[in-house]
Design a protein with these regions (language model features):
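Conserved beta-sheet core of the metallophosphoesterase superfamily
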Residues: 96-98, 209-269
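Short acidic, glycine-rich surface-loop motifs adjacent to enzyme active sites
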Residues: 56-68, 103-104, 184-206
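A short C-terminal boundary segment appended to hydrolase-like catalytic domains
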Residues: 15, 268-408
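N-terminal active-site segment of His-dependent metallophosphoesterases
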Residues: 1-81
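Active-site environment of divalent metal-dependent phosphoester hydrolases
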Residues: 30-32, 67-70, 104-118, 135-140, ...
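Active-site-proximal segments of metal-dependent phosphoesterases and phosphodiesterases across multiple
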Residues: 70-92, 192-224
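Binuclear metal-dependent hydrolase catalytic cores centered on His/Asp/Glu-rich metal-binding motifs
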Residues: 32-47, 81-82, 143-193, 213, ...
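Active-site neighborhood of phospho(di)ester-bond hydrolases with catalytic His/Asp-centered motifs
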Residues: 23-25, 59-64, 94-104, 127-132, ...
Length: 408
């Protein structure tokens, strides 16, 4: 139960609070953010959430874009996002010390611009994790001291586009066996280990069974705090053997003018650590527009807390979580598959090396390589095989209602 002051307490603290850490969701300044920077109004964007942020010993943000000019975008399915290098001012104005770069957009303008993004952020005093000059560097945790604690932060994303390879810059891919071993090793020497992941299904208010299993595995491997992001909407929270898991806090600042629903709503989770680990989360719900991020107040704030509890309730019920994902897949799986297949040109098999053919097949490539896309198509095809699509879809109206709550 989330208290009216936003405190989600898992247990009583032992020896008082030793360390506070907040992680913000997706930030992509887009053109509106660039305008704020150009007009010298960066601090104003965060003014109303600054007191909450400033109480933390460590502030981390999910940075969802390269910092570059829009030249030479890579071939990919999906949009190539960018923000001008000057937009790093927003991260600095928010007081963020760390930027998470393992996501599906960091590499949108190629390896050189990814490395430039790291450099631009570093020059603003913002350390980065989740991307690097090659796979080994991208996978490395960021180790730092904050609040008198030695912290190791890991950051991994799904296999979309722009992931690092042995000899190529990119973001750190989710390679669970390698990643979990690294977290377990770090847990033996660091005071706190944070596993920050990027993956899942956009606009789905619930994580998939695979995402939930993966996040729980990081908790079991020794992570003190597990954070996931990507859905562009709030998802729930659970407490796994002493480790909180935030499945998605929603966007923090992503001012696309044509997005409705829950796109502009989210929450800041602040983890409160005692000597044993995290004993509570402080949750600050907010809404944003192009100009400012504003905490929710009054009945809207309370309604958000009850909504987050609704999203969290089924997380300990595997059968229910399977039903929810089957419902989602029953409505969206066919679209993923149909769009990808529709772009494949006739006779492609005679010219597989043709660049036009390669570009046309990028969507299909993403279905096979991106874990979340693979999940949804595989689930849809299994439902089709078992003649259960209509049965699974009966639960979808409930999910649609959650996508458009009355308070939003």
């Amino acid at each position: 139960m989330i208290a009216e002051n936003g405190l989600l307490k898992f247990r009583e603290p032992e020896g008082g609070t030793r360390f506070r850490m907040v992680i913000a969701g997706d930030v992509c300044p887009c053109r509106e953010g660039e305008k704020i920077v150009a007009e010298g109004r960066s601090a104003g964007l965060f003014a109303k959430v600054a007191p909450f942020l400033n109480e933390a010993d460590l502030r981390v943000v999910q940075w969802e874009t390269p910092l570059c000019e829009p030249e030479n975008p890579i071939l990919k399915s999906g949009p190539n996002l960018y923000a001008l290098p000057s937009s790093a001012e927003l991260a600095a104005a928010g007081g963020f010390e760390v930027a998470l770069l393992a996501n599906n957009h960091t590499g949108d303008y190629g390896p050189e611009m990814l490395l430039q993004t790291i450099d631009v952020l570093n020059r603003r005093g913002i350390r980065t994790v989740g991307a690097g000059a090659d796979l080994e560097e991208a996978e490395k945790p960021l180790t730092l001291t904050a609040g008198g604690e030695k912290i190791a932060i890991f950051n991994f994303c799904e296999h979309e586009f722009g992931t690092a390879q042995e000899n190529m810059p990119g973001s750190a891919p989710q390679l669970p066996l390698r990643n979990l071993r690294a977290v377990a090793e770090a847990a033996r020497s660091a005071d706190r280990v944070v596993a920050a992941l990027h993956g899942g299904h956009e606009y789905n208010p619930f994580p998939s069974p695979r995402i939930q299993e993966l996040c729980r595995a990081f908790a079991d491997a020794g992570a003190s705090f597990v954070f996931n992001c990507h859905a562009h909407c709030p998802e729930g929270v659970e407490y796994r053997n002493g480790t909180p898991i935030v499945y998605c806090p929603g966007n923090f600042y992503f001012p696309l003018t044509d997005e409705g629903g829950l796109w502009r709503f989210g929450y800041l989770p602040k983890a409160l650590f005692d000597r044993r680990g995290v004993y509570a989360l402080e949750i600050l719900p907010y809404a944003f527009d192009a100009e400012q991020i504003v905490p929710l107040e009054g009945e809207t704030r309370i309604s958000f807390f009850r909504y987050l509890e609704t999203l969290s309730e089924p997380l300990d019920d595997p059968a229910r979580m399977k039903q929810l994902f089957e419902a989602w897949s029953s409505r969206h799986g066919f679209g993923y598959l149909a769009r990808s297949l529709a772009h494949i040109p006739p006779g492609w098999e005679e010219h597989p090396s043709d660049r036009a053919v390669a570009k046309a097949m990028l969507g299909l490539r993403n279905l096979f390589s991106c874990e979340a896309h693979n999940d949804i198509v595989r689930c849809f095809l299994c439902l089709q095989e078992e003649n259960r699509i209509d049965e699974a879809a009966k639960l979808f109206p409930y999910m649609e209602k959650l996508q458009n709550p009355e308070w939003a």
